[in-house]
A protein has these predicted regions:
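Extreme N-terminal starter segment of soluble prokaryotic enzymes
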Residues: 1-7
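Short, cysteine/histidine-rich loop/knuckle motifs that typically chelate Zn2+
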Residues: 16
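C-terminal cap of thioredoxin/glutaredoxin-like
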Residues: 8-9, 13, 21-29, 115, ...
């Protein structure tokens, strides 16, 4: 059992939870087996028709809520750096009014355990795919059938996955998670509970990698901190290794794990927004190690072994440079 635990109270639909993915990846990649990370699903919206956030104009009217939620996501993406889709959001409908299905789907993934061939499934990878499908692809992930199809892309058997989503065990875990949110007075997603040898610290809301590492260092009395190892220097070789490890990465994910400084006044979505990153990416593209492609209102970098690896044509590059 690991001494350092981080529990993330979240909802897969929450844009700030999507925006916290770079930080969670950085913790996983930099700290490795020193930390245990788990998620508690809190269900941000039980029913959009009875939900009310007057400041953001979300709740009540379904069509208006979809439009305003997309506006909020687009504005937030320039801050947190994870892209969102540029087409209209149709997340909620008269038949699908809750974010509970996405929460339940993640829990089902944790209960699923093994594929038919005995290979272990990866719930966290499915969580990321579900968040990406919701935010970037604008998929109708409130629909159980859509979620089952998404799960299939990560190795889950769709029918078994849907059966688990409907199971008592999964719904009990879901209810326990909501009860835990109530116990810790969690109303903001994401919220982080850092635990170390009986001591707990709560960080409420979207935060930076630097801030969470400061809290980790404090609660562990400096025993767990970022090492200045050569493997984490922001070199082309190290960045290539990181992208290869995950298969793909958005610019902000690379900048976060390698602690690249964001240039003031620039959107968090772009490569040129981070000091030193343009030169690294240019070198990797020239070597054929990665390919950069448009993704939503941002860009993604694919490792050369990724199924979606496809270098940009000269026409596409010219279009991007003129944008």
């Amino acid at each position: 059992m690991k001494n350092l635990k981080i529990t993330v109270f979240a909802d897969p639909v929450c844009t700030w939870c999507w925006g916290s993915v770079p930080m969670m990846r950085a913790l996983e990649y930099r700290l490795g087996d020193k930390v245990e990370i788990s998620y508690v699903m809190g269900c941000m919206i039980e029913d959009i028709t009875t939900f009310s956030n007057r400041r953001l104009g979300i709740g009540g009217d379904i069509a208006l809520s979809n439009r305003n939620m997309h506006k909020v996501w687009s504005e937030a993406s320039a801050v947190h750096g994870m892209p969102v889709g540029d087409k209209g959001l149709m997340l909620f409908s008269a038949e699908h009014r809750s974010t509970a299905p996405q929460n339940i789907a993640y829990i089902a993934a944790t209960v699923y355990k093994h594929k038919a061939n005995g290979e272990e499934v990866c719930p966290k990878r499915f969580l990321r795919r579900m968040q990406e499908a919701t935010a970037v692809d604008m998929a109708h992930t409130c629909d159980v059938d859509v979620l089952a199809d998404l799960a299939a892309t990560e190795g889950f058997e769709p029918q078994r996955f849907k059966e688990l989503m409907a199971s008592r065990e999964v719904h009990r875990i879901f209810d326990d998670g909501k009860a835990l949110c109530k116990r810790y007075d969690v109303h903001t997603f994401p919220t982080y509970m850092i635990e170390y040898k009986g001591t707990e610290v709560l960080l409420r809301g979207f935060t930076s990698f630097d801030t969470i590492m400061q809290n980790i260092s404090h609660i562990t009395y400096g025993k767990i901190a970022l090492a200045d190892a050569n493997e984490f220097a922001p070199t082309a070789q190290n960045v290539a290794r990181y992208i290869e490890h995950y298969g793909s990465a958005y610019p902000v994910e690379i900048a976060t794990v390698f602690c690249m400084q964001r240039i003031s006044g620039k959107s968090a979505l772009n490569v040129e927004s981070y000091k030193g990153l343009p030169d690294v990416v240019e070198e990797l593209i020239a070597q054929g190690d990665v390919a950069m492609r448009p993704r939503g209102n941002g860009f993604i970098l694919y490792n050369k072994h990724h199924k979606d690896y496809k270098p940009l044509t000269m026409e596409e590059i010219a279009t991007m440079e003129g944008a």
